Curated annotation (Swiss-Prot):
Protein encoded by which gene: tbp1
Keywords attached to this entry: DNA-binding, Nucleus, Repeat, Transcription
Disulfide bonds: none
Protein function: General transcription factor that functions at the core of the DNA-binding multiprotein factor TFIID. Binding of TFIID to the TATA box is the initial transcriptional step of the pre-initiation complex (PIC), playing a role in the activation of eukaryotic genes transcribed by RNA polymerase II.
UniProt family annotation: Belongs to the TBP family.
Any one GO cellular component localisation term in the record: transcription factor TFIID complex
Annotated GO biological process: DNA-templated transcription initiation; transcription initiation at RNA polymerase I promoter; transcription initiation at RNA polymerase II promoter; transcription initiation at RNA polymerase III promoter
Sequence repeats: from-to residues: 58-134, 148-225
Subunit text: Belongs to the TFIID complex together with the TBP-associated factors (TAFs). Binds DNA as monomer.
Domain of life: Eukaryota
Organism of origin: Schizosaccharomyces pombe (strain 972 / ATCC 24843) (Fission yeast)
Protein name from the UniProt record: TATA-box-binding protein
Amino acid sequence: MDFALPTTASQASAFMNNSSLTFPVLPNANNEATNETADSGDAEVSKNEGVSGIVPTLQNIVATVNLDCRLDLKTIALHARNAEYNPKRFAAVIMRIREPKSTALIFASGKMVVLGGKSEDDSKLASRKYARIIQKLGFNAKFTDFKIQNIVGSCDVKFPIRLEGLAYSHGTFSSYEPELFPGLIYRMVKPKVVLLIFVSGKIVLTGAKVREEIYQAFEAIYPVLSEFRKH
């Protein structure tokens, strides 16, 4: 399953929208990343703190699983709690659990997309819980091909950024259309991560397959952001 990255202003707007499942964390979703800071209890955080002294917070992990059997979506929607199914709008059952807080999109083919995990372990645990729910409804569901497709992170550099200057100097990688989307879209090549950079200093990173790519991308962009700091 392919997950398109937000590389245009309209895609970025959709990505940051309140109703977006890809980035479901923003209280002021339209134009700025969340203020949430990294959980100091996360063992990964201290060892990933680079030159910037800032560690992006993981906001959403998107994973896919193959349950390896055909599913009757009407039956699932009828008997499972916190499940909705409106085939005219979307060809999957949308199911939610509270612990770990997440959302699953369950397709008749047996393919499942799980969103909302804040860590790789949470994502896998949630995916297993959904598979177990399907099994309890009488389907011969297995848990195969678990794969993390996208990791979304965010952080705040705590200083304003001159987006026009950044877009001009890094035109090959940047797209900035403030009348369509308030952030600059920066397409990093290595690691292959897309960054949404806001004038306030808030940053959203997406497209990573492993959390290290989020950290690497931020450390790579930080000197550039410092260069275009508004004084």
